[in-house]
Amino acid sequence: MGIYHGTNAAATYPRIIGHEMVGVVEETGADVKNLKIGNRVIINQVTSCGECYPCRKGRGNVCDHLKVRGVHIDGGYREYIAVPESDCYILPDSLSDEDAVMIEPTTIAIQSCTRAELEKDDMLLIYGAGALGSSILKIASKICDHIIVADIMDDKLEEAKHAGAKYTINAMTEDFQAKVLEYTHGRGSTVS
């Protein structure tokens, strides 16, 4: 939404937004080997140069010249998009489009919980209950018992309660810091 409203400092404009994309292959180039017309695919949202040190080490996600579709280059909110075969991942028929677009936020959630070394007795604070925050909540609730979710939308906070948040905070209408301290018995969160 920050890109749409022009408040995302990382974005370049003008810009067609949309970075979590599922599509159907309509046409392929001469060098395409594995994609077929009609394949349903999810698109890697980041592009990398393939030449810099991180790329040469297989870490294109931290490329020195990384560009994100929908942020730095045009994204998926259009009828057609040309994408290199290497950025397309064929989806099984058993996976719905709605579930497929959540693959990227879910992988970030898994990596976040893993890197945080989240433990059962941690007090986790998730700020934001959008796609990424909700994905973190789903993964973290399998590990951690004490999860606080903060957002400014009551409907998202209600969904968070049903998805495993022990506490929720509406950061627009409640004293955020006081609520965190109340829910953590004065300690504050151990992971956020």
Say what each PLM segment does.
Residues 1, 47-65:
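Local cysteine-cluster metal-coordination motifs and their immediate loop/turn environment
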Residues 5-53, 92-94:
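Glycine-rich beta-strand-centered segment in the early N-terminal region that forms part
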Residues 39-40, 54, 80, 123:
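Residue-level marker of beta-strand positions
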Residues 51-54, 72-84:
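A structural motif shared across PLP-dependent enzymes of the aminotransferase-like
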Residues 95-174:
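Mid-domain Rossmann-like dinucleotide-binding core that forms the NAD(H)/NADP(H) cofactor-binding site
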Residues 175-186:
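Short amphipathic alpha-helix with an adjacent loop that forms part of the alpha/beta core around
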Residues 187-191:
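Short SAM/SAH-binding signature in class I
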